[in-house]
Amino acid sequence: MMSKLFTPLQVGFCQLKHRVIMAPLTRFRADDNNVPLPIAKEYYSQRASVPGTLIIAEATYISLAAGGYPNVPGIWSPEQIARWKEITDAVHAQGSYIFLQLWALGRVGDADTLKQDGFDLISSSAVPVDAGEPVPRAMTEEEIKQYIALYAQAARNAVMAGFDGVELHGGNGYLVDQFTQDTCNRRTDSWGGSIPNRSRFAVEVTRAMVQAIGSERVAVKLTPWNDQQGMKMKDMEQQFLHLITSLKELKLAYLHLTNPRVSVDEDVPLQGPPDGHPLEDNAGFVKAWGETSPVFLGGGYTPQSAKHTLDVDYPLNEIGAVFGRLFISNPDLPLRLRDGLPFTPYDRDSFYTPLSPIGYSDYPFSDQAVDLIPVRV
């Protein structure tokens, strides 16, 4: 019997032909003005070559002030929007779909880079990511509202650029996560101090984007189990259950969760149960989300583990399996998964090589793809 991994899935306005989702992958292939390089069009078009695929494009700054790393794309300038439009047109020409992940770094941005651009290192509170690291400035009420507006405008810009929707990056210790978790958020106003208050920033940002472009075009990524970049609060499960339940009311296109026991940086299973939780999983969060819309789960999947997740762990839920590194080196990954074709190994050293086409748009298609995929760039 065919795995659910290869069955259709409705995501917002997108009718996917399978459930193999491309993860948002930072690649540092944007120029000094945060405009994606021309080679990004080929890169994304290649990975859209199996019709009906959903790509979540790489984390993209909502404004220059929200950044802190060079060579990362943005979505605020006309030049950025125009280049992204070329990319989304190429993806749609393949019969596939593309969402854009919206990003603000907060306290984990590079303080020197921000200073050069005239910006402060900011966060929910004046708490550094680690001892000895730069101390961010706590955001004012006015700045919080400005950022909510920036996210909404970024969502509008993404739709203008042809994206089918946007995904709020609410995890991995970046700005939204810095409000959600009390390892960073020490505020005593209405943006901190309690579970509902810590959920508020993520919810208000998401609500603003929904009001801007519609709920069918908005999704959220959360990483409850992540303990990197100063995250994983002690009462994590109650905090994220509250947040997920609150987001559920907004009727989003999907919820994206990273699996436990997976390293955010390495995207591979960790050895042994972390923090004494041998049975950690996302089942409680998936249950809380209910049948609102699909849940995407990602992190370290093999073909076997992805099928097991959909067919055995969550047979009654609408689940998508998010793949990262295998999609880097296998542009026709859904086809290879379906037909059991061998994978091209990825080159870890080229993942984050700024501006380079090597290890980016030069991975080969399978021989079968040449015959079975009708259109390729």
Curated annotation (Swiss-Prot):
The lineage of its organism: Eukaryota, Fungi, Dikarya, Ascomycota, Pezizomycotina. Signal peptide: none annotated. This is NADP-dependent oxidoreductase lnbE. One of its GO terms (molecular function) is NADPH dehydrogenase activity. The keyword NADP applies. It holds the Pfam family Oxidored_FMN. It is an enzyme of class 1 (oxidoreductase). NADP(+) binds at residues 170-173, 257-263, 293-295. CDD domains: OYE_like_FMN. Gene3D superfamilies: Aldolase class I. The gene is lnbE. Belongs to the NADP-dependent oxidoreductase L4BD family. NADP-dependent oxidoreductase; part of the lnb gene cluster that mediates the biosynthesis of diastereomeric piperazines. Lna and lnb clusters encode sets of enzymes that produce overlapping sets of previously undescribed metabolites such as piperazinomycin-like metabolites or morpholine. The lna and lnb biosynthetic pathways appear to be part of a signaling network that controls the formation of sclerotia, a resilient overwintering structure. One primary function of the non-canonical nonribosomal peptide synthetases lnaA and lnbA consists in the reduction of L-tyrosine. Pathway: Secondary metabolite biosynthesis. The keyword Iron does not apply. Keywords: NADP, Oxidoreductase. InterPro entries: Aldolase_TIM (IPR013785), OxRdtase_FMN_N (IPR001155), Oye-like (IPR045247).
